[in-house]
Amino acid sequence: AGFKGLLNGEFEYQSLEVNINKVFRWTLIGNTNFTAQAGYMLGQPPIWKLFNAPASRTGSFTIQAPNSFQTMPANVFWSNKFAHLFVEQTIGKLFVTKFSMPELFLAYNAGWGKLDKANNHEGIVLRDYSNGFHEIGAGFNSLIRIPIYDWFAFGINVGGYYDLTSRAPLNLGENFVVKVGFGFLY
């Protein structure tokens, strides 16, 4: 929050963010990971306090970041109100070996963000995603498994994501990216 006049502050605004995470465990079809996020600002914040869309595309092949838009370029979309939905369905382990335990996943990510009074921010053109941003993905968790102990291992995930918003043919690095993720298995 910012308070005009407090410590010579020039901006008055308040913000509220909500983040809900839930994992649904199904007997036959794996797990559904669900994350919903929303945020709202009152007043007129400075540019560095606006909500920045959680984007993680920095190239054609990059690191997978949970609960972020894999195909959205970083630091492009700004808002003072937003709603995001991240859903990932795992299908279960396809097979198990000492060095591989691949688990198919399907992902859908959606977001909407609106920037009111964008002209109040001088010196830069700010974009919002008020028409929505949608992407889908598929890949394998634990494609490579590196055992550390009998009950503990390091896993490497690989997935591809496509930006549905662009409605353009597949273009690696623009609307399609390949992501590599890392995690611990126990």
Name each region found by the language model.
Residues 1-186:
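Exposed, low-structure sequence patches enriched in small/polar residues
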